[in-house]
Structure formats: C-alpha cells, structure tokens
Amino acid sequence: MLESIDTSMVDWSRAQFALTAMYHWLFVPLTLGLAVIMGLMETLYYVSGNEFWKRTAKFWMKLFGINFAVGVATGLILEFQFGTNWSNYSWFVGDIFGAPLAIEGIVAFFMEATFIAVMFFGWNKVSKKFHLASTWLTGLGATFSAWWILVANSWMQYPVGMAFNPETVRNEMVSFASVAFSPVAVMKFMHTVLSSWILGAVFVIGVSAWYLLRKREKEFAVASIKIAAGVGLFAALVTAFSGDKSAYQVAKYQPMKLAAMEALYDGGTHEPLTVVGSLKIPEMLSYLATHDAAGYVPGINDLLLGGYTLPDGSKALSVNEKIEKGKVAIKALSDFRQAKEEKNEEGMQRARQMLDENMPYFGYGYIKDPNSIVPNVWLSFWSFRVMVGLGMYFILFFIVILFLSWKHQLSKASWLHWVALWSIPLAYIASQAGWVVAEVGRQPWAIQDLLPVNAAISRLETGSVQTTFFIFLIMFTVLLIAEIGIMLKAIKKGPEEVQ
C-alpha cells in the first residue's frame, strides 16, 4: 500500500506545502495576538464606559478583520493539500490526523464565524455585555482553532494514542485524550499561541509608534502601546518558560532534531549550549535536555551509530539496525496480508507477532540511506538562534517600553518609535523561524519514526506540482500585497470617531 518514491516530486511537494504553510502563518499569529489586545480594550470600555476605549477597540478590530479574512483563505488551501499531494499520509493516519482537523472546522471555525459577525456589526444593536462576550468568543474561537491544528501537528512530532491495523494498513485512534492532551501538544500550544501574542503586541506597538512619529492620535497611540507592552511582556516570559520545557521534550522524543539545532555531532555529558561560534554556556544543553547538568546528550554521530546508554538502561540501536527492523516490519505486513488471503490463521498470527515486535521501526524500512535521517543542520541551527535571539530582544523591548511609560516619557522617545516600527518585521521573522526549527528539524519524517516524507506523498507528475507551486506563489503574493495595501490605508485613515 505504501511505496517509497524517490523523485524530485518529493522535494516539490514539500516546497509547495512549506510555501502554503509559511504564507498562512503570516496571518494566524496576528489574528491570535490582536484578539487578546482588542478584547482587553473593549473590556476597559465595558467597565469604564469611556467612549475612548470603544474607539480604540474598533480600530484594532478593523485590522483584525482584514487579517482574519486573508488568513482563512490561505488556510483552506493548506488543508486540501493533505488529500491532493499527501494521499498516502492521509490514508495511513487519516483516522487520527483527521479528527482534530474536523473538530477545528466544525466547532472552532463556526464559533469564530458566528461571533465575528456580532463583533463587527453588533455595535449599538446588541447589549454591551453581549458584544463584549462576542469579542472574547471570537478570540477564543481562533485560539480553539489553533489548539486543534497544533494537536494535529504535535501528533506528527510525537505519535501517540493509536494502534496499527494490518488488515486496513491504517493507524487507528485508540485514545482521543492521549492525542488531544499529549505533553507535546500542550507545550506546543502554549509556546505557539503565546508567541503569537508577542507578534500581535509588537504589531500594535509598531503601528502606534507610527502615529507618534507623525504626531497624530497621541492619546490613542500611548494607550495602545501600554496595553500591548503589558500583554507582550507577559507572553514573552511565558514563551521562554514553555521553550525550556519544549527543549526537554525534543531531547526525549526527537533527539536528532535537538542535535541538529545545536550542530552537535559528538555528544557527551556536561554539554554546553552554543550561543554562537565559540560562545557557549557551560552545561546548559545537558540541563535543558535532561534537567541534569551532568546529563548525557547524544550527538548526530551517536544517533547514527547507536551504542550509547538510554535513560532506561538499554543500548541505543544504530540507524542501520532500525532500518533492518523496519524492513522486517514491512515484510511481516506483507506476509500477514498474504496469509489472510490464503485464510492461514497460523500464518496471520505469526506475521502479526513479528509486525508488532518491529512496528516502532516501521518507518525506517523506507529509509535507504542512514545519513538521510539527519535534517538540515545549518538551517536548524541558525533558525533556532534567530528565534531565541529575537525572543530575548522582545523581552528587553517590552521592558524598556513599560519603563518609559512609567516615567511618562513614551511619547517623547522618538528613537524608540523608530525601533518599534522596525520591530514589526522582526516579530514575523522570529515566528517563521520557530516553525522552520519545528518542521525542518523533523525531516525526513512526515510522522516521527513512523512515516518518512518519501512514502507519504501522492503519485503525481512533478510538472503538475511545479505548476501549482508557482500558481500558489503568485496567488499568495497577490493576497499578501492586497492585505498590506488595505491595512496601510486603514492605518493612514486612523481611528474613526465613535458614532
């Protein structure tokens, strides 16, 4: 049923999915971040009755709506690719992967679609309390949608809660709770959503700083910056905390990804964390990976050759040994299906036992070159440092803003206004870099240790994938330019007077 395909179609299919995902992710974090900030602003309006906060909230809602609409359009195309370009993947794990996506579409999206209408068109038509609830429920719906998408992605990083059925050649869900609330999913949700709050906060601060540079809307801009900086600092600190927990999980479930992130070829105990070049933090990598400064961290060569001692006391297998076990599993699956056709119960039981024993290595049976399980080290290494470095910068950025706000110097610090304005693209770079680390570091696996990308794709002509790649590239670029143009027009117009 699953056959390894080693052609340029794999690379083009990966490139197309990466293009779609990265364009889509230009819009999602701003939606999540603005939802919280505009919700807080409308809450202040509800509590105080001050029309200033209504005017402020409505302005950011307008930008939220523009961004939300384009994000939905790009997201729909992204989900369709699982059926068009990755049909083997959809067949092999569709029963599991499809569940969170179905919940996201049926529950979360309709929740957003319902309450966003009230949020935009319900002013002066519904009560203040109901409108406030609609605003928060719109944001909650977007966050709930992100939860299920991240559950699906986390399952690809750490597949749990399923059992392989050799009769259908599919993985079937046996524990919904294990899939929905796996430790990887919880940490990924926290890290991703809170980092989106950072991006939303930086966006609000940057746009508000533009007004201060133009000496327009001073009260509106200062108030927006204060709220956004508070949200941003909280989010940045929690994101850093969740990043620490995520490092421990990566070391446990995806050690090759961690080794690539650190460009660590030969592991050991008391491993330092490389900042850049020869600048290292002593024993920090061992502590992050094992919660023990003296802990052993395997490097790329260790993971390829095996032989080191695992935490449970057993010896790690080499990749070649895993490949052999994977081939045994694939052969056992073939034997099982043949025995079933022949109605050979004894043969089925024997093949099933062999399959179960080697199933943890099933995906390795499609790996031809042991070195191919090493992801792009250069890209993983530098993407991780860009993400972490900018994360630390944003913590300092928010602290400086809150300090100047406390000193009542916020509107006078023109240097900071320029810094804030140019920090907007930095927030997007940090967000994209995080996904590069997560996805490039997982390669060559579509599902960690279970299904490599070369066995997950559809049988398509390379030319057709290339054609749709460039169609999507042009279409998404046009959408992005249109969104930026509409946003700039709304920003130049500024907040409207409350009617």
Tell me the role of every PLM-derived stretch.
Residues 1-499:
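Polytopic transmembrane helical bundles with strong interfacial aromatic enrichment
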